Regions:
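Walker A/P-loop nucleotide-binding motif
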Residues: 38-59
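A short, basic N-terminal segment
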Residues: 1-40, 257, 261
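Conserved AAA+ ATPase "SRH/arginine-finger" region at the nucleotide-binding site
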Residues: 74-77, 167-171, 181-194
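Mid-core helix/loop region of P-loop NTP-binding domains shared across ATPases and GTPases
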Residues: 80-83, 95-139, 148-152, 189-195, ...
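Short hydrophobic/aromatic beta-strand immediately N-terminal to the Walker A/P-loop
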Residues: 43-46, 73, 125
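Short regulatory helix/loop adjacent to the ATP-binding pocket of P-loop NTPases
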Residues: 61-63, 164-179
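Conserved NTP-binding/hydrolysis module of P-loop NTPases
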Residues: 8-14, 69-71, 79-98
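C-terminal alpha-helical "lid" subdomain
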Residues: 7-8, 175, 193, 197-264
Length: 264
């Protein structure tokens, strides 16, 4: 109802946005993403929850040619080590074997078949990678060595919170860390002017045609969201829902305060 009330196509700063605001960080990520398409390998993207990691990768992968790349997205990572490989096998169209050796051999054969027979590169995106079992980080380099003994035939992106980078810097995971070719971190949009541009871009993308927030309301939003796009979007959407029964076509300070209380 609030979308119709404000004349919007989709929620501001929501998952439906196809063009993300960029002050340079996304352009850099796009460049590094292309690196790992041209020269397959492992990338690490970290940042606080809600900073936009998944949204950024969603936009980047949306334009991938399905005849050239096979996108495999894994968001449920709280599994045992072998279950992750079984998930990969299923995504590749395989019946997953019970034993690790047979499972690895089948995955290797399928990926080589994709490369040699169809010129297709699998792109495996593992979201919430901070929840992966630590055994996976010890195991994965051995899998990469086994599966791609002569050439790299799959790109892997690990997405996770900042603690993931700290984990991978520990000595037990040195082999895994050495396989990471790209490391990037997205940070909150904390500076006032940049945050204002972010929100205004999100509102315009959603279809807003007039100013909805005063400078003071924008500052309340910035402080409450801590510069995190997802949280800013949740607050704006909540404030809009609260505005509908009041008949308001803008979001005054008191409405932002009310939205903050609702979401606390």
């Amino acid at each position: 109802m609030y979308l119709q009330h404000f004349g919007l196509k989709h929620p501001p700063l929501g998952k439906e946005a196809t063009e993300l605001w960029d002050d340079g960080a996304l352009a850099l990520l796009q460049q590094r993403f292309q690196w790992l398409l041209d020269s397959p390998g492992v990338g690490l993207l970290t940042g606080e929850a809600g900073v936009g990691k998944t949204a950024a990768l969603r936009v980047l992968t949306a334009s991938l040619n399905p005849h050239r790349y096979q996108l495999i997205y894994l968001a449920e990572t709280d599994f045992a080590r072998l279950d992750l490989y079984r998930n990969l096998a299923i995504a590749l169209g395989l019946e997953p074997a019970f034993r690790r050796a047979a499972l690895w051999r089948a995955i290797k054969a399928r990926i080589q078949e994709l490369a040699d027979g169809r010129n297709v590169l699998p792109v495996w995106i593992i979201d919430e990678a901070q929840n992966l079992p630590v055994e996976f980080f010890r195991d994965f380099p051995a899998f990469l060595n086994f599966a791609f003994d002569s050439r790299d035939l799959m790109t892997v992106w690990l997405l996770g919170q900042p603690g993931l980078a700290q984990t991978l810097n520990r000595a037990p995971y040195a082999a895994m860390a050495s396989r990471i070719q790209v490391r990037l971190r997205l940070v909150p949009i904390a500076e006032r002017e940049r945050f204002k541009h972010l929100v205004e871009h999100g509102l315009q993308q959603a279809g807003a045609t007039h100013t909805l927030l005063s400078d003071s309301a924008m500052e309340l939003l910035r402080q409450a969201s801590r510069g995190l796009p997802r949280q800013a979007g949740r607050l704006i959407q909540t404030a809009m829902r609260l505005a509908v029964p009041k008949g308001l076509n803008h979001l005054p300070d008191e409405l932002i305060h009310e939205a903050i209380e609702v979401l606390q």
